[in-house]
Amino acid sequence: MKTGYCIKTIKYKLRCSHPEWLTETEKYYRQVLDFYFRLLLEHEEIWELNLLQMQGALERLTIAGRDGRVPERPLPFDKVPVYFRRSAINKASASLKSYTEKYKNSGDDLVYTIPDTIDASVTYFKGMYKDFRENKISLKVWDGKKWNWMDCRLKGQSMPEDGMMLSPTVVFREKEFWLHVPVKQQTEDARNAKERMMSRENVCSVQFTNTDIFAMCCVLDGDGKQKAVYSCRGGDAYRSKCKVLLEKIEKSRVYTDKDNAPHANHKYYLRLKNLSEHYAHQVSREIVDFCVREEASVLVFPSYDKEFTKVVRYRSGMYSPLYLGSRIREFLKYKAWSTGIVVLELSAEGTSSKCFVCGGKIKKNGAMFECENGHQGSRFLNSARNLGVKCLKDFERKRKI
């Protein structure tokens, strides 16, 4: 069986004796990054190179060679460690490639503007950190005059035993410093969806709703027979908690609108954000655990056109279970892949208008439905079943072609 890998980011709260040094380091990093970004804009001939080749080209332009080569544009900074410099080069190159790809995909002519500075956090390559443990790390930081090794304390979840740590990033967010550590983990099953369907493995289809049920899940076997059903609940509780916070924001506006505060009601909006992330993580974990229990190796989401999605999200409200569906999808993709489950998106056309049992037209009545032949039940489960069957039929049809 093919194996693959997934990368997830673990976030640690960072505590240290000199937080101002972290600020100075970020400021210095942005200056170096800005220099290389502007240099890149002047040399379009290296834009098509890959990141490693771009790094070599930029270093030849700015760093003196061992053979006595004089650089064309010497780096205008003193005491820039090699891995600090390479981290800045890598981020500048990635920023430019992302920018050019955006225009290339849109078909528009490339018209770039030079930013005053690039809003980037410091990514620490090897050589800039050491002694990483679950509760501490040593970082090389700039105090404005010289480089120092600073011991920092970490608070967060433990590192997976089978995980390989990649280059961490120090991020300043919500008045605190955080260490974002990407972790690479191996997945036991890296087969694509086509290979899994040929093996007639179980499929789990998901229908998101705007009720107490965040998501209705249905597992079908290779023949389309229903094996298990699971509903992820908590939508009403989420909606109620959001409503309480929104009411507090509305009441406080009487006092905050007049004082011109730059971040009025920040603590309430932060709670809303944390609440949304909590439920999105909880529901996505429930769905993945259900798939593992029922041995479903393919997970299917409904896909809608952009205009329909925009209208539905607007009508349901920003803090509704259905609106949270997009965040749940986002978390599901990496959580599912880390356990060897493939995620697919399939057009939802026709899944909510016909009966799963007989294919007849249905009439909706709240959360229930009744078809023209008398079959009735949950309309969300009916949609999930139809989505799963549609997925199986699509792959069956492709095999025959």
Give residue spans per PLM region:
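Gly/serine-rich nucleotide phosphate-binding loop at the start of the catalytic core
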Residues: 1-91, 112
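A general structural signal for short secondary-structure junctions and capping/turn motifs
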Residues: 1-3, 129-130, 169-172, 194-197, ...
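A general secondary-structure signal for short beta-strands and their flanking turns/coil
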Residues: 3-9, 174-176, 201
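Generic detection of short hydrophobic beta-strand segments and adjacent strand-loop junctions
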Residues: 4-16, 146-154, 230-234
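Stable alpha-helical structural segments in soluble proteins, enriched in small hydrophobic residues
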Residues: 32, 87-99, 381-391, 395
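Generic structural signal for hydrophobic core residues of well-folded globular domains
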Residues: 40, 96-100, 291
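Acidic carboxylate diad motif detector
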Residues: 55-176, 184-187, 322
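Positively charged, helix-rich recognition surfaces that bind polyanionic ligands
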Residues: 179-401
